[in-house]
Every structure is written in structure tokens, then in C-alpha cells.
């Protein structure tokens, strides 16, 4: 095998990959560089609807809500300037109409209203598994950080399920939660 040929091939391959990676020759591939730049900039900011949808999907995936029209999800969050704000929509919404750009700093509270609950009326959830699932999903989306205290409240229980992200449940993990009674989640 000719080592000069292999070396030249590697250098040429690296140059091609570097050039394509910078986007200089993306037009050669039929890509529109303006769209690529706009997409990257749009993802730097979040809308209140995108935040709301991430929270709603995490609640649904953790089996806390059904995502139907009989549920209302109100998300209170902290802005980078220190003020707080909130966004609310029914559970069957996609958040697409909520388009206010926000400078998100962190979640504060999630309030849930459930009316006319027919499905899962008596469904019981393992408190520890529910807490772990929700915090894992919210953390994976960048909405929670290690060390934050998260508590899940239920109107049929006097004590919440609480714990610290990255450490686990510290109280109430032995409880079961009746799905329809979960009404508030706080983040400190």
C-alpha cells in the first residue's frame, strides 16, 4: 500500500468534510444556507408555547395527565430578568398559538385542573416512579437542573412527593397518587 496516497486521501477527505461542515459549499448539495441559519437562531429563543408544550408532553409521558380538553395546564416560570410569568392552555392543545418569545430561566410551578374525569378515574400511580419519570423528562428537556427541589401535590394526600433532581425522592415516595387528584407541582 502506498503511504503517500493514503496520507493525501486522508488530507483531502478532511478538507472536504471541513468545507462541508462550515456550510461554504452547502449550495453544491442543494441546501439553503439561509434556512439553516434561521433555524439555529430560532432555537436560541423559546416561546411560551414551546415551553408549555414541553411541560405538557412531560406530564403526559409520566402518566400524570391524559392531554384532553377536560384538563388545564398552567405553567409558571421565571424569566432571566427575575420576573415571573405564566402560560395556560387546555390539555388537548399543542401550544402553537402561544407565540410570545421568552427569556426562560426556570420553572416555578405547574397547576393542573381536571374536570369531568372519566378515563383513569381511580388510577393509582406509584409516587416515586411518577416523580422520577417527570423530573427525568423535564431535566432532559433542559427545564430542570440538578439540585432543584420538585414536589408533586395531590388533593387527596396531606403530604407531597418531594425530592431533589439528581438525588431522588426524599419524602412521600412510599405513597400512591390518585391520578385525577394530582393538582400542583412546585419547583424550588
Regions inferred by a protein language model and the residue ranges of each:
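Gram-negative bacterial Sec-dependent N-terminal signal peptides
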Residues: 1-27
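Sec-dependent signal peptide cleavage junction
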Residues: 20-46
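Feature for mature exported/ectodomain regions
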Residues: 38, 43-103
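Short, flexible domain-boundary/linker segments around small modular repeats
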Residues: 43-60, 116-137, 179-188
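Solvent-exposed loop and beta-edge segments used for protein-protein assembly and interaction
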Residues: 67-69, 144-146, 176-181
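Mature extracytoplasmic domains of secretory-pathway proteins
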Residues: 83, 88-151, 155-158
Amino acid at each position: 500500500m502506498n503511504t503517500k496516497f493514503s496520507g493525501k486521501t486522508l488530507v483531502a477527505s478532511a478538507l472536504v468534510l471541513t468545507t462541508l461542515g462550515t456550510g461554504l459549499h452547502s449550495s453544491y448539495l442543494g441546501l439553503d444556507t439561509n434556512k439553516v441559519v434561521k433555524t439555529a437562531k430560532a432555537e436560541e429563543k423559546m416561546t411560551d408555547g414551546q415551553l408549555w408544550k414541553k411541560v405538557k408532553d412531560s406530564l403526559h409521558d409520566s402518566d400524570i395527565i391524559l392531554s384532553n380538553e377536560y384538563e388545564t395546564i398552567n405553567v409558571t416560570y421565571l424569566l432571566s430578568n427575575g420576573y415571573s410569568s405564566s402560560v395556560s392552555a387546555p390539555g388537548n392543545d399543542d401550544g402553537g398559538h402561544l407565540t410570545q418569545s421568552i427569556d426562560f430561566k426556570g420553572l416555578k410551578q405547574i397547576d393542573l385542573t381536571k374536570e369531568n374525569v372519566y378515563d383513569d378515574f381511580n388510577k393509582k400511580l406509584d409516587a416515586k416512579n411518577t416523580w422520577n419519570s417527570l423530573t427525568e423528562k423535564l431535566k432532559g428537556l433542559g427545564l430542570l437542573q440538578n439540585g432543584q427541589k420538585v414536589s408533586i401535590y395531590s388533593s387527596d394526600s396531606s403530604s407531597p412527593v418531594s425530592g431533589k433532581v439528581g438525588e431522588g425522592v426524599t419524602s412521600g415516595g412510599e405513597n400512591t397518587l390518585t391520578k385525577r387528584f394530582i393538582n400542583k407541582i412546585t419547583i424550588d
